[in-house]
Amino acid sequence: GFIGDIWSGIQG
């Protein structure tokens, strides 16, 4: 995901 966001694990 984006830098430090909660979606990191989902979006890649």
Curated annotation (Swiss-Prot):
Primary site of residence: secreted
Secreted is among the record's keywords: yes
Keywords per UniProt: Secreted
Gene Ontology CC annotation, any one: extracellular region
Tissue: Expressed by the venom gland.
Subcellular location as annotated: Secreted
UniProt KW Ubl conjugation keyword: no
Top-level taxon of origin: Eukaryota
Protein name per UniProt: Venom peptide 6
Record organism: Brotheas amazonicus
